[in-house]
Design a protein with these regions (language model features):
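Aromatic-residue-lined binding/catalytic grooves and analogous aromatic/hydrophobic interfacial grooves
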Residues: 124
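Flexible, glycine/proline-enriched loop segments at strand-loop-helix junctions
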Residues: 136-140, 172-176, 187-188
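Conserved Rossmann-fold dehydrogenase catalytic segment
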Residues: 161-173, 206-207
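A conserved active-site-flanking secondary-structure segment within enzyme catalytic domains
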Residues: 137-162
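Glycine-centered loop/turn positions within well-structured domains
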Residues: 127-128, 149
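Extracellular/periplasmic ligand-binding modules, especially the Venus flytrap/periplasmic-binding
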Residues: 177-181
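A short beta-strand/loop micro-motif in the catalytic core of glycosyltransferases
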Residues: 120-121, 141
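Extended, subdomain-level signal for the structured scaffold at the beginning of enzyme domains
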Residues: 1-120, 128-132, 162, 183-338
Length: 338
């Protein structure tokens, strides 16, 4: 049975939609130099799929957005154009992990949106970006397991917690590592559009639960993890490039999780391939693609792999091609309990 929204003590404050809007407007931020693949695409896919909110992808600059560790895309608009066309600002701003957590232009835009009344949501290490704006002062927050101790030392006015998948504190929400993007997006949807919208969307994705329960203490670096990571990185002669075919109307969530996981093995790179240079997803995400290369391995996504089954399926594929240690290394990076 699907989970309802978290208890009242863990709630997110969202004002009524601004400027006479009938539905909330959610802006998802991208920095062109580097934006985490799943952190960005999963909230986009889930919120768009619901049909209950308006979603816009906003990049700092014009042109290509490099996703990390794989894929490239085009945003819908830029900070400047968004400000010109939506002077009242967004109702909600989602901040993925960014290559630069301290870029002045990004921090200034986030502060501006917050000052205009936007609720701020950070996915994974997007929490560091929000912390750099000062918006996490006197808040309870979380982030990726690897980053939390460093964040505790740097941002002492924030209470950092390990045991919650996502944390809602007033008008700010933060999440743990990459794989938290699915439950956190459904929880956010429940606040924005009601529990029934979250349940219906989750049902379509095959997701059964999205509570904030989390055992953060199970994630950490061990000698075995270090050994497999170094071995994969240094054995360059074994590195591969995978072609990930995409077609018009592709499922964003499954493509994102597939590319993200394979891109974290430290043995493989992933590129989207298609006949067209720009391929639009089911819900309007514009992915940049290149022609397939016969020298590359082809990644296929089995029919029926979606939602909660997507990541376990990819991790099983990685274990089959490489080994279970590499699959576990990827799961650790994604803060996914394997």
């Amino acid at each position: 049975m699907a989970e309802d929204a978290p208890a009242a003590a863990r709630t997110l404050t969202i004002a009524m939609p601004k400027a006479g809007r009938t539905r909330p407007l959610v802006a998802i931020v991208a920095d062109n130099a580097g934006t985490e693949t799943t952190d960005f695409i999963v909230p986009y896919a889930i919120l768009k799929r619901s049909g209950a909110v308006d979603v816009v992808a906003v990049s700092a600059d014009e042109g290509t957005v490099e996703l990390m560790p794989a894929l490239r895309m085009l945003a819908d608009t830029t900070f400047d154009r968004f400000d010109a066309t939506v002077p009242a600002g967004a109702d909600v701003v989602i901040v993925p992990a960014l290559h630069r957590a301290d870029r002045p232009a990004v921090l200034a835009w986030l502060r501006k949106q917050a000052a205009a009344g936007a609720t701020m949501v950070a996915i994974c290490d997007g929490a560091e970006v929000l912390a750099n704006t000062g918006l996490l002062r006197q808040r309870t927050a979380t982030s990726h397991w690897y980053s939390r101790e460093g964040l505790r030392r740097r941002f002492t006015e924030t209470k950092w917690v390990d045991d919650r998948r996502y944390v809602m504190d007033g008008n700010v929400m933060t999440t743990t590592g990459v794989s938290a993007s699915i439950p956190a997006s459904l929880a956010l949807l429940g606040v924005l559009a009601g529990p029934s919208a979250a349940r219906e969307t989750a049902r379509g994705l095959g997701v059964q639960a999205w509570s904030d329960d989390h055992d953060g203490g199970r994630f950490g670096v061990t000698a075995r993890v270090v050994a497999i990571a170094l071995m994969n990185r240094l054995a360059f002669w074994r590195h591969e490039t995978f072609d990930l075919p995409v077609e018009s109307g592709f499922d964003e969530l499954t493509v994102a999780l597939t590319a993200d996981a394979w891109g974290r093995t430290w043995r493989s790179d992933v590129v989207a391939t298609a006949d067209a240079s720009v391929v639009e997803s089911r819900h309007g995400l514009r992915l940049l693609a290149q022609p397939a290369d016969v020298r590359h391995v082809r990644v296929t996504i089995p029919a029926g792999r979606r939602g909660d089954s997507a990541l376990p399926g990819v991790l099983a594929d990685i274990a089959a091609r490489y080994d279970d240690a590499t699959s576990s290394w990827v799961a650790l990076q994604l803060e996914y309990p394997k």
